[in-house]
Amino acid sequence: MGIEEKAPSGFMLAKVSDLVGLIRKSSLWPVTMGLACCAIEMMATGTPRFDISRFGMEVFRASPRQADLMIVSGRVSQKMAPVVRQVYDQMSEPKWVLSMGVCASSGGMFNNYAVVQGVDHILPVDIYLPGCPPRPEMLLNAILELHEQIRSEPLGANRAEAARAVEAAALRATPTHEMTGLLA
């Protein structure tokens, strides 16, 4: 006879980390970070046709202090990179980053000195969303993937250590102009 049988009906037994993961994934608030063409598709995701509010993301926040998800949509110029980083630093923990579109993920067709060749050179990215521009359905799918990632994340100091390790690895990444490979 286990504890489940002794508990009165209507009670649910769960780990605190599972409940916190469920709550976090159901109440993501994205910060407004539309930088280029992909921002149009990101805005379309907020319309009634795609209804992002069913995932707890009704309003895109203008203040980073009220947001916990940054959707970097579009190319990031060298001049905009410090601003993007500052907005990220102003977001409260826990925070997540979704890189939307090929330009945000790798610089896209803009392989030049003026565009950051992937936002992961300035921020730790949790989900990469390919496409030029990605459709709203693809963004919704990426958000659902992020929900699963959030739900299974550890709590407390373990999460902070993991986030610091990911950020350090991202900032140590080799810049694309120094990479050698098939195109070199």
Swiss-Prot record:
GO terms for biological process: aerobic respiration; electron transport coupled proton transport. GO terms for molecular function: 4 iron, 4 sulfur cluster binding; iron ion binding; NADH dehydrogenase (ubiquinone) activity; NADH:ubiquinone reductase (non-electrogenic) activity; quinone binding. Its cofactor is [4Fe-4S] cluster. It holds the Pfam family Oxidored_q6. It is a peripheral membrane protein. Binds 1 [4Fe-4S] cluster. Gene3D superfamilies: 3.40.50.12280. It is found in: Cell membrane. PROSITE patterns: COMPLEX1_20K. Belongs to the complex I 20 kDa subunit family. This is NADH-quinone oxidoreductase subunit B. It comes from Beutenbergia cavernae (strain ATCC BAA-8 / DSM 12333 / CCUG 43141 / JCM 11478 / NBRC 16432 / NCIMB 13614 / HKI 0122).
